[in-house]
Design a protein with these regions (language model features):
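Immediate flanking context of iron-sulfur cluster ligation sites
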Residues: 42-59, 80-85
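Charge-rich, acidic-biased intrinsically disordered regions
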Residues: 76-86, 113-117
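Acidic, glycine/proline-rich low-complexity segments that act as flexible tails and inter-domain linkers
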Residues: 1-47, 99-117
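Short cysteine clusters
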Residues: 61-64
Length: 117
């Protein structure tokens, strides 16, 4: 588990910046894929972020958990919606998903707190 999901996400920025500089076409394409897949359509963006969070838990991607917990929060997801999402991830991912679901609720709760001054 992370002591601070806000700090953890900020720590990824330099490495991601290097990746964008080193592989600009790949990262531009990846960004386009992300934007296209998360755009509102039959499903709204919040629902898509909740799906992405569930997949992040099931695939055990800490970085993805942080990014999608934050995005779900920014799109208005409630703690109750997060728990329902995590329940689905646990159902699909069994035991390991339980451990990563704990990461996801921890990330959501930390990211929902106002930044320390």
């Amino acid at each position: 588990m992370q002591d601070s999901w806000n700090a953890y996400l900020k720590s990824l920025s330099p490495a991601l910046r290097e990746l964008r500089l080193g592989a600009p076409e790949v990262m531009k394409s990846f960004s386009g894929l992300a934007q296209g897949s998360l755009a509102a359509g039959a499903l709204d963006t919040k629902t898509k972020e909740l799906i992405a969070l569930a997949i992040s838990v099931a695939t055990r991607c800490d970085d993805c958990i942080g990014f999608h917990a934050k995005a779900a929060l920014e799109k208005g997801a409630t703690r109750e919606e997060i728990f329902e999402t995590l329940g689905t991830a646990i159902y699909l991912g069994a035991g390991p998903a339980v451990m990563y679901a704990a990461h996801a609720i921890e990330a959501f709760d930390q990211l929902a707190q106002p930044a320390a001054a």
